[in-house]
Amino acid sequence: MASRTKTGLMETPRSKPSPPTPRVSKPTVTKSDGNSPSPVQSTRLSIDRSPQTVNSKPVSDRRTARVPTPPEANYFLIIICMAFQKSQSRLGKGTGLLVQQTQEDLRKANEQIERLKKDKAKALDDLKESEKLTKEANEKLREALAAQHHAEKSSEIEKFRAVELEQAGIEAVHKKEVSWKKEVESIRSQHALDISALLSTTEELHRIKQELAMTADAKNKALSHAEEATKIAENQAEKAEILSSELSRLKALVGSDEQKKSNEDDEVVSKLKSEIEMLRGKLEKVSILENTLKDQEESIELLHVDLQAAKMVESYANNLAAEWKNEVDKQVEESKELKTSASESLDLAMKQLEENNHALHEAELGNATLKEKVESLVTTIGRQENDLEESQHQVCISKEETSKLEKLVESIKSDLETTQGEKVRALLNEKTATSQIQNLLSEKTELATELENCKKEEEKIKKAMESLTLDLQEVSVEAKEAKEKLLTCQAELELCGVQIESLKLAEKDTNEKHGKMLEDARNEIDGLKSSLENTENEFFNSKTEWEQRELHLMLCVKKLEDGNFSVQEELSKVKNLLHLKEVEACAAKEEDAKMQTNRKELEEEIKDLQEIVEVAKADSMKLKESLVEKEDELKNTAAENRKLREMEVSSIDKIDQLSKVKESLVDKETKLQNIIQEAEELRVKEIDYLKKIEELSAAKESLVEKETKLLSTVQEAEELRRRELACLKKIEELSAVNERLVDKETKLQSSIQEVEVLKEREAENIKQIEELSLSNERLVEKEAKLQTVVQENEELREKESAYQKKIEELSKVDEIFADREAKLQSSTQENEELREREVAYLKKIEELAKLQENLLDKENELHDMVLEIEDLKAKDSLAEKKIEELSNLNKSLLVKESELQDVVFENEKLKSKEALSLKTTEELSDVKQTLADKEKELKTAVVENEKLKAQAASSFQKIEELKNLKQSLLDKENELEGVFQANEELKAKEASSLKKIDELLHLEQSWIDKGNENQELKVREASAAKRIEELSKMKESLLDKELQTVIHDNYELKAREASALKKIEELSKLLEEASSTHEKGEEITNTNPFDNSTGEQKVQESPLEAIDRHLKDDTTIHWSAHNVQVIGKGEKGKDKDTVESEVYHLEKREASSERDTEHDFAEEEVDSKAEGSENFDQLSNGLSLAEQTEDVVSKDQQQKKKKPLLRKFGNLLKKKSSSQK
């Protein structure tokens, strides 16, 4: 506000038309005729010019000297009084001339009054222009209101954008839900596949059960056939022995027949061997079927494990769904709360805007200083009225003291000389002042540039403003003291006060107008120099004119007497006007008191605003920190979401891998089904073949059963090892899955905690927003007050226009009134400047709105600016020192400057507060945007939750379906339990294997290394499957051949029996002759019971011992047979005792060898079991061992089948040799 008054006071002298008057009076100096009383005119004009020159000085000093003051008017009146006295003393000399001169002076005064009227008209035009400016300012205010409406519309647009962003977030949530649905569907599909696999396995188990039953029946039939075959073979062996005895007798006669028979026997042996190999092939097929059964049981167990894992996954999915539901409900509630808080924050922001507008209006209350200035003008007018009263008294005294004019003239001459000296001094002072002013202007330009920078940076110096407020309070106290001093010093320092006011106003004006003012000041200084030269010339002319006036004073006295009457009439009018002005002065004083009270209230409000601004700053800093923290949290949540997505991708990949594994298992199952179908076809064929072999398979049932048991134990061990490997792998996979799930749970818990923290922070932010809303309401109230102040300013302007009209009426008195009118014009210019400043303020408000965006960047530069401010303060201190040197004439006026500066600082503080309020509004707008974003996120979360609910409902339905399937599976499992009861021995072995599994858990690392070996085993399995298929084909071909050979052998045996019977009949006739041979036959019968007993023992022996005995004694049998043949052929002449001893030793050797083989076989069984436990860790080589064992078993079976035939053949040879002997 002070700056407005400064510019107004400084710009008033430009409109003043006073300087041209002295130039008009120059030609009057040359005229000295009687028609044109030049001396009187020159004296009058010189007297008139003297105050004008004084007025021109202030113009040159540029607001340092104001318009002529009342003391100059007094001086003019004194000169008039002296003229009256001289005229009274010289009444006889020239009263007529004086009357003419006074008339001419009156004419000139009238001309000056007309000029003043013209100036008044110009001032009125200026007032009209100022009114136009006010209208423009009002239009700009309207534009500002329109801008506010535009801002509101833009805020609505931002709301719509926020809604669009929310919709985009909702779409993203939809996408996520779709992805979750796909995952759930994939899991369900996997469950369905598992269930289908279980069903297929159960069906296969039923089929396998049926096949086992069929194979068991076939085995029984085959064993019965084998027993029948063994019986037939024994009968045939007995017959062969009889025949061999008979053939030995008839050997000499029928040597060729014996050779044929031996060849036939060999053929029989070969046929029997082929039959035994066929039986072994069938046994191998049965063992293969048992292996397939075991594999399928293992697959069933694996499927059970998978079911359990699926159950775990389902339970975990249900838990996750429940947790997601809870989180969704919480997020919905939070979204509702955030919506309410956002609406409240918007309302609060609108309130803050209204409060800022009120603050702007309150800032305009600073215009109250205009009232004080008007009152100061009224006081000056009152003083001038007092001076007029004194002049009237002096006129009365002049009538009484006409006799004393001569003395006064002499005193006037002395005064003139003193005034000349004073004028010379004043000229010197003016020169020094001009030089100082130039220096000050140069300094002030620098200060002005620095002040502009300071003004731009005042918003950055918020901390320094607090210290300035304290200084302002001190300055206000000093201003009050200075006002008290002013009242005492104004009477004494009226003349000096005008000059000092003009200087200070010029200084203030220079601070605002910078370089332009320098040029104006230089031009004015040039004008002042010319005016000083003119005044010097006029002074010399005035001396001559005074001498001439002394001659014409007598003439002027008469004219003055006539003019006194008119002057008295004018004085009466002036008195009336003075009374009116006194009444107005009283009213102005009352208004001053009101303004002071209003000013105090404004200072208190400013303090409150400062506190509010500080609180708003702290709140804004907190909001910024909270926003930064929220941004960091959003980044962390985004990173966690990315990690979760990566984990999901990895889990999906693993699921794909598991699906591939399942597909491979399905392929294997299809292969197994194909194999089973082929086995069924083979079974059909075997049934046909078994019907033919039932007679031969009875004797070998026990051996086959034990062999199958051994093979089953080996295969079970291998299967158990495989199951253990599969279980361990699945356990590892499940453990990894569980760890991932645990990690996800921890991450979800951390995210939930972060959401709770965000909620707490949002609550804090809402509280801060409520506090800001209260401060905004206060600002709105202050803006209302500012509007009232604006209205009061408008009323003051109207009053000022009324005062100007009154001043125009007073201007008729003389140049004094003209000077007063110039002051009024300066006030009008101040009003114009105020209007211009209002426009500038509006522009600045717009600029401040733009600067708000740059405030954050400029806060970092505050420290540098503080140093610059200190430099500026140093420069200001230097400038203040210079100003104090110039203003030593009156310190009280400096106090007024400080008051004006206080007002300026207050205005600047208000601006800074407005800027802070705008910042807070921007921050609130940012907070609104963040809240809008959060609302969008919450909406998306709500949509996702709804989708999740739908998915959860569908998942619950599917879970119910799965439960039903589980029940069906449980029923099937109950059915399978019946199957598992038959495998109690396997369960016992599984218990032992489980114990070993606990030990093998420590060897998990070794299993990882053996993964490659498992792959090789898979390759071997494939090759083994191919071999099995080839062997099955070979077996079918061999079975066909063997059956044909067996049938052919049976026919041959029957033919031989017939031929043998015939020969027996022929030989029976020869028995009577061979009595000695009969006795030997009895001895042979004695040995035969021994052999029979040994045979019975052999039958009583276990089939496993017989197998071992045949395996170990093959060589001994061949050796004994060879010896028997040698005995039969080469040693016919030995004694009976030697033959019997040899046979006895051979039988002992056979028995001992059989016992040794039994012992060795038992030891081999123990060793095989130990090796089975030791080789349990080497599951990768199980298939190769199985193949080796199968080869060994096949060889053993072949040897076993050969051994009894060889023994029987040896016995026959013995009998033949004995019979021959």
UniProtKB/Swiss-Prot annotation:
Parts forming coiled coils: 95-149, 202-543, 587-1084
Region (Disordered): 1-68, 1073-1221
Biased composition (Polar residues): 32-58, 1084-1097, 1175-1187
Protein origin, superkingdom: Eukaryota
Protein localization: Plastid, Chloroplast
Keywords: Chloroplast, Coiled coil, Plastid, Transit peptide
GO biological process, one term: reciprocal meiotic recombination
This protein's GO CC annotations: chloroplast; microtubule associated complex
Record bears the keyword Plastid: yes
FT transit peptide: 1-82
Principal location: plastid
Family to which the UniProt record says this protein belongs: Belongs to the WEB family.
Protein name per its UniProtKB record: WEB family protein At4g27595, chloroplastic
Organism of this sequence: Arabidopsis thaliana
Taxonomy of the source species: Eukaryota, Viridiplantae, Streptophyta, Embryophyta, Tracheophyta
